[in-house]
Amino acid sequence: MDAIKKKMQAMKIEKDNAMDRADAAEEKARQQQERVEKLEEELRDTQKKMMQVENELDKAQEELTGANAQLEEKEKKVQEAEAEVAALNRRIQLLEEDFERAEERLIIATEKLGEASQTADESERVRKVMENRSLQDEERVYQLEAQLKEAQLLAEEADRKYDEVARKLAMVEADLERAEERAEAGENKIVELEEELRVVGNNLKSLEVSEEKALQREDSYEEQIRLLTQRLKEAETRAEFAERSVQKLQKEVDRLEDELVHEKEKYKAISEELDQTFQELSGY
């Protein structure tokens, strides 16, 4: 009987131990289940976050693509402005060459005027000494008149040439104004591009990337932004250089206009002197 009681007690103890182990196993299973659910929830959150990051990165890529297109357009406009400046330089050079040729003609006309004046003085002296040789004097006067007419024709030709130079200068001024307007538009566009790139940079900096691949892509985008910013600065520098070139050309045009006015005044004085000489010779 005692053996049976001991055996029953042992079985009860074993049963209690088994129940305790079962409860412990059940608790452990419950904890494992909670851990699995928590991990699944974290995984879902991570997946959502990754999808959000991917969407934001795609949006940033689109913005960078747009910025690249705008930058290429700006560089194209800067190249066009530089080409216009080069064309203006060539036109200024041609105008200077025309101006030099006109100056040479002016010198020739002035020399002929001096010769005509000297000839007129000589004719006056001969007329006083040899009043009886009227026929020879008259022939001499005709020669002087022909020389004076030739000098007047040269002066008129030079005047027409200077009028042509003035028209060309007016065209150059119009071209310069258009180039200045394009340079100003280019500067405004650069400011807009810089603002857009600043917004893109701020958006990229606000992204929270948790995976190594996303971090690498963000670094790549930041490098692209840095390169774009550098290219924008270069384009801005080129635009400023183009503007300075336009200002320099404007000063050169102003100088040529002043010289043109001065030379016209000289031609006017020569023409008046030629007319006066012609009248004096006609009086003889």
Swiss-Prot record:
PROSITE patterns, per this entry? Answer: TROPOMYOSIN
Q: Which domain of life is it from?
A: Eukaryota
UniProt keyword annotations, A-Z: Coiled coil, Repeat
Q: Where is this region: Disordered?
A: 1-47
A single Pfam family it belongs to is Tropomyosin
Q: Known SUPFAM superfamilies for this protein?
A: Tropomyosin
Stretches of Basic and acidic residues bias are at 12-38
Coiled coil (residue ranges): 1-284
Which Cys pairs does UniProt list as disulfide-bonded? none
Which InterPro entries does the entry link to? Tropomyosin
Q: Which family is it part of?
A: Belongs to the tropomyosin family.
Q: Quote the record's domain comment.
A: The molecule is in a coiled coil structure that is formed by 2 polypeptide chains. The sequence exhibits a prominent seven-residues periodicity.
Alphabetical list of PANTHER family matching this protein = TROPOMYOSIN
Role noted for this protein:
Tropomyosin, in association with the troponin complex, plays a central role in the calcium dependent regulation of muscle contraction.
Q: What is this protein called?
A: Tropomyosin
**Native source species:** Trichinella spiralis (Trichina worm)
